[in-house]
Regions:
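Long, contiguous, secondary-structure-rich segments that constitute the structural scaffold
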Residues: 19, 28, 35, 39-149
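Long, low-complexity segments enriched in small/aliphatic residues
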Residues: 1-40
Length: 149
């Protein structure tokens, strides 16, 4: 249930909050089925994708002084997740109104109960959704990223 009595959203919104300057999205990975509840119990699949990671652009990695494999913390208005940085040209900054906007991406196949290291990316996502379908909004939300350690 996404709305309290009286129809007000129960979530914390963080649009244009300078503490969370980067756009984040979530996605699946080929190696783990959906949330990973079945595939994370298979050793050969865990060997391929053993832990939570966050894809970041080469440009953002330089800006934040991060290297591939560095431990990082991703935070939003709703929570924090620990992951490993995956510096990649797959994710690139884009321009909005002459401003550079960085985007990061996290898989949502990690969680609490099965093997594998990492928190669920859904700890960061808002619990709002379409009023008619109740489909949650997990594809665009604001985060910050910093080195751990």
């Amino acid at each position: 249930r996404m709305f309290s009595e009286g129809g007000l959203a129960e979530d914390v919104f963080a649009t244009c909050d300078t503490r969370y300057p980067y756009v984040a999205t979530t996605y699946r990975v080929t190696e783990h089925w959906q949330t990973g509840v079945l595939s994370r119990n298979m050793p050969w699949l865990m060997e391929l994708v053993p832990r939570q990671f966050v894809e970041i652009s080469v440009e953002l990695a330089k800006e934040k002084n991060l290297k591939n494999g560095d431990p990082v913390e991703i935070s939003s208005a709703r929570g924090k997740v620990e992951a490993v940085a995956m510096v990649t040209p797959r994710v690139r900054p884009f321009k909005v109104a002459n401003s550079t906007v960085h985007m990061v991406g996290l898989p949502w196949c990690f969680g609490w109960m099965t093997p594998g290291v990492g928190d669920s990316a859904n700890l960061l996502t808002p619990t709002v959704g379409d009023a008619n379908t109740m489909i949650p909004e997990t594809k665009a939300f604001m985060v910050n990223i910093k080195a751990r350690g």
